Amino acid sequence: MALHTRVLRLVLSGLMGALLVVSKQAMSGLPNLEPVSLLLILFALELPRETPGAITVFILLQGVLYGFGLWWVMYLYVWYLLALLAWLLHRMDNAFFWAVFSGLYGLCFGGLCAAVYLFAKTPAFALSWWLSGLSYDALHGIGNFVLMLLLYRPLRRALQMAKKQLRV
């Protein structure tokens, strides 16, 4: 791979990570409504080589902005897992499928995050933490579903056009 292509991919990863942070910040006033899941799924589908770098930038910047607490440890696996699952299902090109997938991931988000507490605290604590946040997980799932249903097709087309222009 030419040096130019490697540099372009590195810059893309950084820009994608920054976009994740900025878009999350822009919607931070809305409870559990975030575009990160939508964007990560689309990145994994259209720019799979750059996605791990983008996730790394996003996670590190979230730690810098909000502190590297126990919540941050959750981010070390939930976002990579989402990208991996999307990449494994990359042949699907159906907005409704991805809306359901994203909605279910949002619904399961608290359960996935609670896994940290299995090791950091106790299984009872992890279960109570997860159950106490189910209403937020429901909002997260609904928000993910709606955002994906509305924005999957136009954003995927935009990414495909950008890829052609950048020749990546």
What is each of the regions a protein language model found here?
Residues 69-76, 94-168:
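Membrane-embedded alpha-helical hairpins and interfacial helices in multi-pass inner-membrane proteins
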Residues 2, 6, 14, 53-56, ...:
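Juxtamembrane loop-helix boundary motifs flanking transmembrane segments in multi-pass membrane proteins
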Residues 52-63, 97-107:
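Central hydrophobic cores of alpha-helical transmembrane segments
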Residues 38-41, 63, 67, 83, ...:
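Hydrophobic transmembrane alpha-helices of multi-pass small-molecule transporters
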Residues 21-34, 57-89, 117-121:
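Interfacial aromatic-anchored transmembrane helix boundaries in multi-pass membrane proteins
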Residues 1, 45-48, 85-93, 153-160:
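Structural signal for the C-terminal ends of transmembrane alpha-helices
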Residues 1-42, 46, 50-54:
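Hydrophobic transmembrane alpha-helices
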